[in-house]
């Protein structure tokens, strides 16, 4: 499972860089873990070149095109037989079960499904495997005659699965009578902080988008002992903020320079991120933390992005090979839709009660100010599995 987490986290960084290219100056927020799990359901029925390309993009085959030293690559090959499709999907089964375990300290609602035109019936073996490994049931629907009705039904299902938080995942023109197969993936997250911010300390402050432009935000504030890490190249400050029970953490990577976000994004690799956020790099400080209160709801049509990353054949009517899914010819993936929703506020969740803690700085621990008043990167990690659940960029309030 460790190696699967490595693959998913590497995919998160690759995908973030691709999304950043087409979203300059815009916020980014997505769940690489959830997208990976959804695509793995499709990979389960892929064969030949189609399967190989998907495995490469999803970093299941980490021996090609990965920037890392030979020793670490050798170690990864030893710990995970990446050519073994069965092992990959067994690991997903374990991972999904671990991450989605019922928990009173955070809400994580997912909606993952594959919808295929009914004239392309699924193999029984494929249906059984998807249910076993992913707890999902691919749906055969009538895109040819009732595409808009199907779109509305999909949106209603996603809304129910996410308790009303994710609405209208599929836009009016997202599917039509020529649609063969679509993958829908939506995720809603809300957690309770270990140390909550006091509402009375939240004030309006300027958020500096660049050196000349700023926008007002509701800036939260707390004084607390927190874990800080320093990044030297490019210069940035990192912070770990635990959610209650410490199952999850929010990491913030704040460039020293107001205009330093792009440089930081380009510098990040899987190995560097692992190094920066390792326990050895963490130091406890008395932190005066200023963090914007924000809500992000981002939607993505991932077809062009995934194609540009190398997953081309899956979207091609003439080249796609999903013979492990259906015996019908010309079945291909029409699109992959993803939507993720997160709220960052004082308590961390609407239902949280009680007051936050405030400390006086008397112990011999160094003090530092962490003022997230300009663009930063952030991600939410499931600590037990070391999985990046969400990855984001906040640069435009």
Curated annotation (Swiss-Prot):
PROSITE patterns in the record: SERPIN (PS00284)
Q: According to the UniProt entry, where does the motif Nuclear localization signal sit in this chain?
A: 74-77
Record-annotated site: Reactive bond = 362-363
Source organism per UniProt: Callithrix jacchus (White-tufted-ear marmoset)
The gene for this chain is SERPINB10
Pfam families noted in UniProt: Serpin
Q: Where in the cell is it found?
A: Nucleus; Cytoplasm
Q: What does the function comment of this entry state?
A: Protease inhibitor that may play a role in the regulation of protease activities during hematopoiesis and apoptosis induced by TNF. May regulate protease activities in the cytoplasm and in the nucleus.
Q: Which UniProt keywords apply?
A: Cytoplasm, Nucleus, Protease inhibitor, Serine protease inhibitor
Q: Name one GO molecular function term.
A: serine-type endopeptidase inhibitor activity
Stated name of the protein: Serpin B10
Q: Member of which family?
A: Belongs to the serpin family. Ov-serpin subfamily.
Q: Which GO terms describe its cellular component?
A: cytoplasm; extracellular space; nucleus
- Coiled-coil region(s): none
Lineage, top-rank taxon, reads Eukaryota
Where are the membrane-spanning stretches? Answer: none
* UniProt main location, coarse: nucleus
Q: What is the lineage of its organism?
A: Eukaryota, Metazoa, Chordata, Craniata, Vertebrata
């Amino acid at each position: 499972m460790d190696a699967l987490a490595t693959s998913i986290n590497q995919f998160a960084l690759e995908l973030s860089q691709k999304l950043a290219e087409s979203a300059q100056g815009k916020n980014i927020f997505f769940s690489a873990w959830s997208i990976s799990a959804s695509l793995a359901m499709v990979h389960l029925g892929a064969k030949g070149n189609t399967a190989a390309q998907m495995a490469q993009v999803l970093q299941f085959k980490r021996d090609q095109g990965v920037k890392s030293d030979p020793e670490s690559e050798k170690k990864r090959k030893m710990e995970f037989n990446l050519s073994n499709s069965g092992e990959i999907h067994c690991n997903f089964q374990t991972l999904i079960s671990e991450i989605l375990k019922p928990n009173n300290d955070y809400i994580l609602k997912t909606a993952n499904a594959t919808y295929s035109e009914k004239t392309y019936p699924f193999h029984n073996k494929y249906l059984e495997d998807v249910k076993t490994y992913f707890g999902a049931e691919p749906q055969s629907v009538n895109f040819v005659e009732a595409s808009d009705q199907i779109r509305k039904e999909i949106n209603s299902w996603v809304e129910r699965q996410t308790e009303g938080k994710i609405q209208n995942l599929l836009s009016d023109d997202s599917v039509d009578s020529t649609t063969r197969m679509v993958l829908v993936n939506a995720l809603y997250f809300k957690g309770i902080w270990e140390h909550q911010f006091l509402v009375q300390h939240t004030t309006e402050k300027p958020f500096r988008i660049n050196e000349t432009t700023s926008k007002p935000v509701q800036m939260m504030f707390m004084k607390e002992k927190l874990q800080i890490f320093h990044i030297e190249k490019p210069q940035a400050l990192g912070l770990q903020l635990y959610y209650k029970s410490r199952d999850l953490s929010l990491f913030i990577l704040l460039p020293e320079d107001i205009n330093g976000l792009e440089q930081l994004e380009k510098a990040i690799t899987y190995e560097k991120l692992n190094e920066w956020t390792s326990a050895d790099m963490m130091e406890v400080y008395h932190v005066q933390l200023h963090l914007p209160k924000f809500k992000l709801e981002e939607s993505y049509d991932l077809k062009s992005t995934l194609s540009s990353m190398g997953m081309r054949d899956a979207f091609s009517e003439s080249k796609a090979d999903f013979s492990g899914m259906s015996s019908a010819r010309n079945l291909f993936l029409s699109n992959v839709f993803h939507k993720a929703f997160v709220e960052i506020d004082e308590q961390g969740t609407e239902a949280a009660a009680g007051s936050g803690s405030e400390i006086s700085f008397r112990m011999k621990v160094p003090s530092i100010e962490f003022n997230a008043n300009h663009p930063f990167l952030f991600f939410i990690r499931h600590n037990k599995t070391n999985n990046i659940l969400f990855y984001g960029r906040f640069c435009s309030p």
